[in-house]
Structures are given as C-alpha cells and as structure tokens.
A protein has these predicted regions:
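Helix-to-loop junction immediately C-terminal to a conserved catalytic motif
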Residues: 67
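ABC ATPase NBD coupling module
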Residues: 83-104, 137-138
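ABC ATPase C-loop
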Residues: 157-158
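Helical segment within the ABC ATPase nucleotide-binding domain
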Residues: 180-192
Length: 219
C-alpha cells in the first residue's frame, strides 16, 4: 500500500494549518482493493502542495478520499477546523473544499459563460487570472482546446473562493507552457493567503518550482 514522504520546494510563508486542510490517517480503496494506507496531509491557507508519485501510487484516490468521493475505512478530514469526515461530497464543497477532477467535470454543450453562471460568477472574474478566458465566453466548452478547458475547470474552482482547492492531473494532455500558466495561476491563488492549494502534477520539476513542498506517494 502507498506510503508518503514530504519533500521541500520553493514557496511563500503559509497561514495557520487549522484554517486550511488537515487529513489524518486516511485509509481508502475500492471494494477489497486498498489503495491508501495511513495517508496524512496538512496544507495551510497560502500554501501550495504538490502530490507526486508514479501511476498507481494513489494520487487520484487521495484527492477523491479527501473530497468524500471514495469511502474511507479510517482517518479524519478537517477544513477550516470543521470535521468533514462524515460529510457528503456536496457538504464538503459547501464547507469550502473544492476539487477539480482529472476529467474536468465540464458540460460540452454549455458555453464557457454558462459554466460560470452555474456557480454564480462570471468569465471576467476568472479572466483576471487566465486572460485567455475573456475571449471564450460564448464558445461551447466542447469546442475549446484541452488547455482552454483546463483553464475553465480551474477557473471555476478559483472563483468559488474556496478554503481548499484540489486539482487532479493538472497538466494531463497539455503542453508544458500551458501547464506552466495554470501552475502560475494556482500559485497566485495561494499567495492571496485565503486558500490552501493541492495539485496532482506529472511535471515534477515545473510544479516543485512553484509549490511550497511536495508529498510523494509510493507504492
């Protein structure tokens, strides 16, 4: 079963862990297949942490367990000091724990602007971080490139002003330059000091250049 090891990176000073994310001793899996064993992760507001590891190490399962999308056998999840261990995925979102899945969770037939309307926001707000979105408001998401779709997905998470934002497989299928722009946007969100950012990323050098530290999951 995967273990975890922390590695240091660059990054800014963070706030109080109690106001961010605290996951302790999580064990999770799918049926009889146990994928995570005793996973712990603490991320303070203002901090950006990269979750790293080989395919099959449990990175996606870790984020899904924290988000309440896979059952856990043991452990606790707290956000902003509130115990969310038994909370539903929707209740966790309401408490400020927002997750961007690896499939981005978008609706191909809806426009970019319609997506932001669904969360009570606008493209203009997200375009402050990702300027390219300003020209995509009327375009159907299904007609957007992979990089544009990922900017929409991450932007939707950011405009909710969450206490914790988790992004799975940030750069999957994207050019390094596009991935770097997304990482810079997440770094800026963390630097604003109100959000703890967790990102699963395959470009290790790129993410450790902007993250405060990395958590390496091993099989």
């Amino acid at each position: 079963l995967p273990g975890n090891t922390s590695v240091s990176a660059g990054g800014a000073a963070a706030g109080d862990i109690a106001q961010g994310l605290s996951a302790e001793g999580l064990c999770a899996g799918y049926g009889d297949a146990k994928v995570l064993s005793d996973l712990s992760l603490q991320v303070a507001p203002g901090e950006m942490v990269a979750v790293l590891g080989r395919n099959g190490a449990g990175k996606t399962t870790a984020l899904m367990a924290i988000a309440g999308l896979v059952p856990t056998d043991s452990g606790t999840v707290r956000v902003g000091g509130a115990d969310l261990t038994r909370a539903s995925p929707g209740a966790r979102v309401g408490a400020g724990l927002v997750s961007v899945p690896d499939d981005r969770g978008l609706f191909p037939s809806l426009s970019v602007a319609e997506h932001f309307s669904l969360v009570g926001s606008s493209v203009d707000e997200a375009a402050e971080t990702f300027p390219a979105l300003a020209g995509l408001a009327g375009r159907r998401v299904g007609a957007c490139s992979g990089g544009e779709q990922q900017q929409v997905a991450v932007g939707l998470g950011m405009v909710r002003r969450p206490k914790v934002l988790m992004v799975d497989e940030l750069s999957m299928g994207l050019a390094p330059q596009v991935a770097a722009e997304l990482l810079a946007g997440l770094r800026a969100l963390a630097d604003a000091g109100e959000t703890a950012v967790v990102v699963v990323e395959q470009f290790v050098d790129a993410v450790l250049a902007v993250a405060d530290r990395g958590l390496v999951l091993s099989e």
